[in-house]
Regions:
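Short amphipathic helix-loop junctions that connect adjacent transmembrane helices
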Residues: 25-37, 227-243, 247
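Intracellular juxtamembrane helix-capping segments at the cytosolic ends
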Residues: 26, 108-123, 311-324
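Helix-to-loop junctions at the C-terminal end of transmembrane segments
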Residues: 54-67, 258-271, 355
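C-terminal ends and interior cores of transmembrane alpha-helices
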Residues: 76-91, 281-293
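Cytoplasmic helix-loop-helix junction between adjacent transmembrane helices
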Residues: 100-136
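Glycine-rich segments within core transmembrane alpha-helices of 12-TM secondary carriers
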Residues: 129-147, 339-347
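C-terminal membrane-cytosol helix-exit motif in multi-pass small-molecule transporters
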Residues: 169-189, 377-379
């Protein structure tokens, strides 16, 4: 493994802790501060909206100032957003807490660019493996983030969880330590990135469209159910916070641990077959969720939810990098992430409403619609 890829992995571990901490805490804190129950998942949803709105900007900014500075600015920004969020908990401001989560989402949008940066420091044939390895770093984030957040939650007396976000600020800024030693590979000038095909020309390619569908709806299913899980488990089913946190950790680990083999599986069997497997894994989640809502069933459902996301998202991302030329990469990556995370934002925004108005089981059945869309795209678009 080359030095640059190793540094990106280490930096990603700390930069991405914002994501599992947000998943772990936002619904619980949202339920505490929100004026009505249906707004409990609004902070989580706004963090995803932040990801969506900053996705294209992140790619655009990096095309001008480079990956290294882009990642450093994002770490500083996430640190500031975490401090703002801690302050919002101290003064018990739901509005300010939502703003903090939105800005943290903006930082997460930049951290999603690590997977593309990884591709740029390896040979193109190694791209699926590089993407898998960089996503594998998410396991470290999944265990470091929530554990540190849980340990530090009472650091500020009378303001539970404010300490968690102070800890997140430290974790976020720590990623810059590794970026200092990162040597950005030489690329074409920023002016040349203005050339190449338009977005509509790019998306007219069947492979590009397939990559987009797989990634977008994988995120839709995963986010729709994951956002609702802490509230459904802890607040509705009265399962302990520690058990709820452990299920979320296992889910995030399941999202990234298969990355050890996913790249090799794609290389051996092709993108389509691995995407089909992802759909089947999602189906296991839905079937499991139709039974009793207990600790074990939540655990099994969320593990398979993570596995399905991994197969679909890595397949989609590794297929995407085959669909554009060097001068088009930031445009293609930016628009892809804009669409993927906009759909994720819609799923996250609607999760709290659907959970409040329907049920956990109904939400899982709704996800069948997304699975049908992915399956249809696979059958109609042959890769």
């Amino acid at each position: 493994m080359n030095k640059n890829l190793s540094l990106l992995i280490l930096s990603q571990i700390f930069a991405f802790t914002a994501a599992p901490v947000t998943v772990f805490l936002s619904g619980i804190i949202g339920s505490k501060f929100s004026p009505i129950n249906t707004l409990a998942t609004l902070p989580m949803a706004l963090s995803v909206v932040g990801i969506a709105l900053f996705a294209f900007f992140a790619a655009k900014l990096m095309s001008i100032i480079g990956r290294k500075l882009g990642f450093i600015y994002a770490s500083v920004g996430t640190c500031f957003a975490s401090l703002l969020t801690a302050y919002s908990i101290i003064i018990e401001s739901f509005v300010l807490y939502n703003l903090g989560c939105f800005l943290i989402g903006g930082g997460i949008a930049f951290s999603h660019q690590y997977r593309f940066a990884a591709v740029e420091v390896v040979d193109k044939d190694y791209a699926p493996k590089a993407i898998s390895i960089i996503l594998l770093a998410g396991i470290g984030s999944a265990f470091i983030g929530p554990n540190i957040a849980n340990i530090s939650k009472g650091f500020i007396s009378d303001h539970m969880y404010a300490g968690s976000y102070l800890a997140l600020a430290i974790l976020s800024i720590s990623s810059t330590i590794f970026l200092i030693f990162y040597q950005e590979p030489k690329t074409i000038s920023s002016n040349q990135y203005k050339t190449g095909r338009s977005f509509f020309e790019l998306i007219s390619q069947p492979r590009f469209l397939q990559a987009l569908v797989a990634s977008a709806f994988a995120y839709a299913v995963m986010t729709f159910l994951m956002t609702a899980t802490p509230i459904s488990m802890h607040l509705m089913e009265k399962i302990s916070l520690s058990k709820t946190g452990f299920v979320i950790q296992l889910h995030i680990a399941a999202m990234f641990l298969p990355s050890l083999v996913t790249g090799n599986l794609i290389k051996r069997f092709g993108h389509s077959k691995i995407m089909y497997v992802g759909v089947l894994l999602f189906l296991v989640t839905i079937i499991t969720s139709l039974f009793e809502q207990n600790y074990i069933n939540y655990m099994v459902a969320l593990i398979f939810l993570g596995l399905g996301w991994n197969f679909l998202f890595i397949s989609g991302t590794s297929l995407l990098v085959l669909c554009y030329r060097e001068e088009e990469k930031f445009r293609a990556q930016g628009y892809n992430d804009l669409i993927v995370y906009s759909i994720q934002a819609l799923a996250s925004l609607s999760a709290g409403v659907f959970l409040s108005l329907t049920s956990w089981k109904t939400m899982n059945l709704i996800c069948l619609i997304f699975l049908i869309i992915i399956a249809l795209s696979l059958s109609l678009i042959h890769i």
